From Swiss-Prot:
This is Tryptophan synthase alpha chain. The alpha subunit is responsible for the aldol cleavage of indoleglycerol phosphate to indole and glyceraldehyde 3-phosphate. It comes from the Bacteria. Tetramer of two alpha and two beta chains. It comes from Geobacillus thermodenitrificans (strain NG80-2). Keywords: Amino-acid biosynthesis, Aromatic amino acid biosynthesis, Lyase, Tryptophan biosynthesis.
Length: 268
């Protein structure tokens, strides 16, 4: 996976199929135009253990529209045809991968132009077989590291591929007004052991929070705030006369979240 160098990464997350497959492609293009460096494409799942209510509702909408793991992966090829050039990470729970078949999953992801995979409910200790497949197919398996994993940070960081995803706080995803005071120390500890870029997600939802974190890590992931914006724009996105204006409003919102990362860093 080729990542930009000498700049903080803006990594947005959206749910495949919310509100539709075609609109997911349009929103991906809008995010690229807004300055996204990597796109996390979430695969809807009926029991999303790591996700809060905003992403759960988005997943329910996508599942109601018959979105599946294979269809979500095929959306990557559609995005490539429409001009999305940034790396795309498939974010999926393990059960759909198991149902499809692990090798089939990696083969399909590679065939359709994905750049990596992230499986939030896959324990690091059980990731060996998938790490072998990720190496064979050239698709990094992105690792998650949480604040409870201090003894395991060095172990997880040593095996990290692509980038290392730090979970800002325990619990599910979702918009948060404040971030833990200990987050800076945690990120510093992870960076000391990591050979790949260190990004942080879960709960980052305002430009002020992005600005606060940019010197402590190599990038931020914003998910629930963007999915919430899509939810607010649902009716307009699905109205022919208002679709383009709604996409432009979404892009403007994403740009405001990325903006602090484009300002000079005080210490990197």
């Amino acid at each position: 996976m080729r990542l930009p160098v000498n700049r903080s990464l803006f990594i947005p997350f959206i749910v495949a199929g919310d509100p539709s497959a075609d609109l997911t492609v349009d929103l991906a293009l809008a995010l690229q135009d807004a300055g996204a460096d990597v796109l996390e494409l979430g695969v809807p799942y009926s029991d999303p253990l790591a996700d809060g209510p905003t992403i759960q509702r988005a997943a329910a909408r996508a599942l109601a529209g018959q979105m599946t793991l294979p269809k979500a992966i095929q959306l990557v090829a559609d995005m490539r045809k429409k001009g999305v050039k940034i790396p795309i990470i498939i974010f999926t729970y393990y059960n759909p991968v198991l149902q499809l078949g692990e090798e089939s999953f990696f083969a399909l992801a590679q065939e359709n132009g994905a750049d990596g995979v992230l499986i939030p409910d896959l324990p690091f200790e059980e990731s060996g077989p998938l790490l072998e497949l990720s190496e064979r197919f050239g698709l990094p398996l992105i690792s998650l590291v949480a604040p409870t994993s201090k003894q395991r940070i060095e172990q997880i960081a040593s095996a990290a591929q692509g980038f290392l995803y730090c979970v800002s706080s325990l619990g599910v995803t979702g918009v948060r007004e404040t971030l833990p005071e200990s987050l800076g120390h945690f990120l510093g500890e992870v960076k000391r052991h990591s050979r790949v870029p260190v990004v942080v997600g879960f709960g980052i939802s305002t430009p002020e929070q992005v600005a606060m974190l940019k010197d402590a890590c190599d990038g931020v992931v914003v998910g629930s705030a963007l999915v919430q914006k899509i939810e607010q724009l649902l009716e307009r996105l699905q109205t022919l006369e208002e679709k383009n204006a709604a996409i432009a409003e979404f892009a403007s919102y994403a740009r405001s979240l990325a903006a602090p990362l484009r300002e000079p860093c005080s210490s990197r």
